Amino acid sequence: MSSLSTSFDSSSDLPRSKSVDNTAASMKTGKYPKLENYRQYSDAQPIRHEALALKVDETKDSRHKFSSSNGENSGVENGGYVEKTNISTSGRMDFEGEAEAEAVKRYQLRSFALLSSNARPSRLAKSETHQKQIHVESIAPSLPKNAALERGHDTALPAGTSSNRCNLEASSSARTFTSARKASLVSAIFETSAESEHGTHPKQAKLKRRTYSTISTHSSVNPTTLLTRTASQKSDMGNDTRRIKPLRMDSRVSFHSEISQASRDSQETEEDVCFPMFRLLHTRVNGVDFDELEEYAQISNAERNLSLANHQRHSERTYNHTDQDTGFTNSASTSGSSAALKYTPEISRTLEKNCSVNEMYVSENNESVREDDKPDLHPDVTFGRNKIEGEKEGNDSSYSRAYYTLQNTEYQIPSRFSFFRSESDETVHASDIPSLISEGQTFYELFKGGDPTWWLDCSCPTDDEMRCIAKTFGIHPLTAEDIRMQETREKVELFKSYYFVCFHTFENDKESENYLEPINVYIVVFRSGVLTFHFDPISHCANVRRRVRQLRDYVSVNSDWLCYALIDDITDSFAPVIQSIEYEADSIDDSVFMTRDMDFAAMLQRIGESRRKTMTLMRLLSGKADVIKMFAKRCQDETNGIGPVLKSQTNMVNLQAEQENVNQNNSNNQISLSNSYMQTTSQPRGDIALYLGDIQDHLLTMFQNLLAYEKIFSRSHANYLAQLQVESFNSNNKVTEMLGKVTMLGTMLVPLNVITGLFGMNVKVPGRNGSIAWWYGILGVLLLLAVISWFLASYWIKKIDPPATLNEAAGSGAKSVISSFLPKRDKRFNDDSKNGNARVGVRRKSTVSLPSRYSRYN
């Protein structure tokens, strides 16, 4: 025991081993002088005197027991005790019992900073707050005083660390120690590691008490000893699973590859961008955290069983006071719940499925739940920007029983999650994540260990489900935010372990009120699988699964191919709608000039509806070509080796070679780094660019066709409006002709009114005498005037010609009504105007007779 203790003065002569050199080189303390100075004088930190003052009596008793148990070193130990008493009076501080364990904790805390993968080099010398809290919690107060020293006894140490420790023990045992007063705390840590190395039993560790040591404030401290101590602590704590387990809550190892750990500069850059990254809680297998899924399933099942038990008790209690009618209430009271039934999973299909492991626990705890503490019947449901407020628990018991006893209704819970594997003929459909696995099955078995190629389709995920999926598959918070907020912009984004595609489809049900409304589809493509998200029911996923089953014997179905197939199916869904628009455009274009007597309002509505559909499809297709073009370009860059993958690999290789100064193994390091990087990253394959080019051609063709159809509809609309104007003009001409005839009759009756008016004055009225000759005279005059007027009017009408052109009609409309009935002056011109050839001849004569500037040269 005493051979392992050494002072700081004697430790300065220790030989520098190779493992220590490697440790110092890997830590690069030369680049950080503050870190080296801090470690050099790290032992000069003060320790409380209260622990020593309170344990004076225990110290004396332990001295007596220790001196009696170790007879060989009794003289040295007693001398140490005497000197310890003098030292304590002189103001120096010792380690005894809990005070010594407290000092050991302080040195172990410093080693945590080296184990933290996301701490900057400038912060390695300081103990972070969360690390201190975890360490204090890891050492329970109920443990014995040497509980911290007993950890890691059963764990094997690395070969390099054990050999380094043996060399230091051999060099330290060969020396003689002049005083036990100068024993350092480094020897205490070496002693602890040596005991764990030889498998010392905890009972024997209690008997082997170390000599009391003081902290030397001498400035000449050998950094080699401190580095060796740090390396030994790191190896001990690295193999201690019980201590590393709580530390994983604050680590970010799952989001850092080997390259990012090797490059401290790139790590600092990543830490400067403060995103709420998820902490590593479990081990990932092929990029999937199956333990997270298992925990979420257990929590969901427990909450579901508890809620079912509470509502079952409530329904049974209220059923005794109400009728046995189990039907739904009116739609006014369940309007909000109907939307929840459409988009969110229900508690359970039937109450008969409550036989689970957690049912006993639920039945035991149900009695302690008060009526006021019961949850609402319908909790608030939140997905993205849409939120359905839950309905408060009321007196409507018939609805509650029917809502939670679905065996009495014909309603089926919608399947919002679908799991598919490329080599499987089955597709698992479930209403929530825990229902994806059957009883006795695990998610690891469902995913086949995460081997390619799997596909999980999620419809209307809730916030909790989205949070679980993001933690399970390592989705970046920006991607999760775009999905939850339902980002409308189409784009392609490349991340470290996946790439994210946002693509739009539409509602293709003609009977739906949301026909042709856009639907956002989000695709997250990993190296071994695909995640898809959408907030409306779509048929593209089923079409792609059917296509995979047909082509998997001929095509290598991987995650990139699934992404291409889904985009291609979305693109092909536009073809039937565009074809129907083409037929409609041809029909309208032909009907514009043929339909005269049809209802013009229906025709205008038909044209307007077709134009609206065309503009909607053009808006949906406008951004897709650019997205596919950018996607294909990145695939080609990845094939040519000029993409972001090669750039990051080259930078990492250069940094690794510069730090380690390895010039001969650059090619080997580059291959290993490339392989490790490719295992943790996901880039679109180069052969997918060929398929994407085909999709781009389809998109451009459809967009150009829509442009042509929109022009046809626009021209047809203008032509039909022109036809309506012509019809309106013809109707006005008919009305004008009728009014002209009425005017002619009125003109004929005006002279008759003059005659009757004249004879109505105070004149001699014929017939005073007894003869009736005056009567026949008046009647004859009237008839004569009528006949004369008729012949004159007929002759006048024959002289008037109807307008032959629209210009003549417009000119005649500007004249008065009487002037339009006047005959034309040039009768010959009017006769020739009826013959087109005669008019051309007149024009030719007038053209030749006019002077011309070319005639003078003849």
From Swiss-Prot:
<dbReference type="GO" id="GO:0022890">
    <property type="term" value="F:inorganic cation transmembrane transporter activity"/>
</dbReference>
<comment type="similarity">
    <text>Belongs to the CorA metal ion transporter (MIT) (TC 1.A.35) family.</text>
</comment>
<feature type="compositionally biased region" description="Basic and acidic residues">
    <location>
        <begin position="367"/>
        <end position="379"/>
    </location>
</feature>
<feature type="compositionally biased region" description="Low complexity">
    <location>
        <begin position="67"/>
        <end position="81"/>
    </location>
</feature>
<dbReference type="GO" id="GO:0071944">
    <property type="term" value="C:cell periphery"/>
</dbReference>
<dbReference type="GO" id="GO:0006812">
    <property type="term" value="P:monoatomic cation transport"/>
</dbReference>
<dbReference type="GO" id="GO:0005886">
    <property type="term" value="C:plasma membrane"/>
</dbReference>
<feature type="compositionally biased region" description="Basic and acidic residues">
    <location>
        <begin position="386"/>
        <end position="395"/>
    </location>
</feature>
<feature type="compositionally biased region" description="Basic and acidic residues">
    <location>
        <begin position="46"/>
        <end position="61"/>
    </location>
</feature>
<protein>
    <recommendedName>
        <fullName>Magnesium transporter ALR2</fullName>
    </recommendedName>
</protein>
<feature type="transmembrane region" description="Helical">
    <location>
        <begin position="772"/>
        <end position="792"/>
    </location>
</feature>
<feature type="topological domain" description="Cytoplasmic">
    <location>
        <begin position="793"/>
        <end position="858"/>
    </location>
</feature>
<keyword id="KW-1133">Transmembrane helix</keyword>
<feature type="transmembrane region" description="Helical">
    <location>
        <begin position="742"/>
        <end position="762"/>
    </location>
</feature>
<dbReference type="InterPro" id="IPR045861">
    <property type="entry name" value="CorA_cytoplasmic_dom"/>
</dbReference>
<dbReference type="Pfam" id="PF01544">
    <property type="entry name" value="CorA"/>
</dbReference>
<dbReference type="GO" id="GO:0015095">
    <property type="term" value="F:magnesium ion transmembrane transporter activity"/>
</dbReference>
<dbReference type="GO" id="GO:0055085">
    <property type="term" value="P:transmembrane transport"/>
</dbReference>
<feature type="region of interest" description="Disordered">
    <location>
        <begin position="318"/>
        <end position="337"/>
    </location>
</feature>
<dbReference type="GO" id="GO:0015693">
    <property type="term" value="P:magnesium ion transport"/>
</dbReference>
<feature type="compositionally biased region" description="Low complexity">
    <location>
        <begin position="1"/>
        <end position="14"/>
    </location>
</feature>
<feature type="topological domain" description="Cytoplasmic">
    <location>
        <begin position="1"/>
        <end position="741"/>
    </location>
</feature>
<keyword id="KW-0472">Membrane</keyword>
<keyword id="KW-1003">Cell membrane</keyword>
<comment type="function">
    <text>Plasma membrane magnesium transporter.</text>
</comment>
<keyword id="KW-0460">Magnesium</keyword>
<feature type="region of interest" description="Disordered">
    <location>
        <begin position="1"/>
        <end position="81"/>
    </location>
</feature>
<dbReference type="InterPro" id="IPR044089">
    <property type="entry name" value="Alr1-like"/>
</dbReference>
<feature type="region of interest" description="Disordered">
    <location>
        <begin position="365"/>
        <end position="396"/>
    </location>
</feature>
<keyword id="KW-0812">Transmembrane</keyword>
<feature type="topological domain" description="Extracellular">
    <location>
        <begin position="763"/>
        <end position="771"/>
    </location>
</feature>
<keyword id="KW-0813">Transport</keyword>
<dbReference type="InterPro" id="IPR002523">
    <property type="entry name" value="MgTranspt_CorA/ZnTranspt_ZntB"/>
</dbReference>
<dbReference type="GO" id="GO:0010961">
    <property type="term" value="P:intracellular magnesium ion homeostasis"/>
</dbReference>
<dbReference type="InterPro" id="IPR045863">
    <property type="entry name" value="CorA_TM1_TM2"/>
</dbReference>
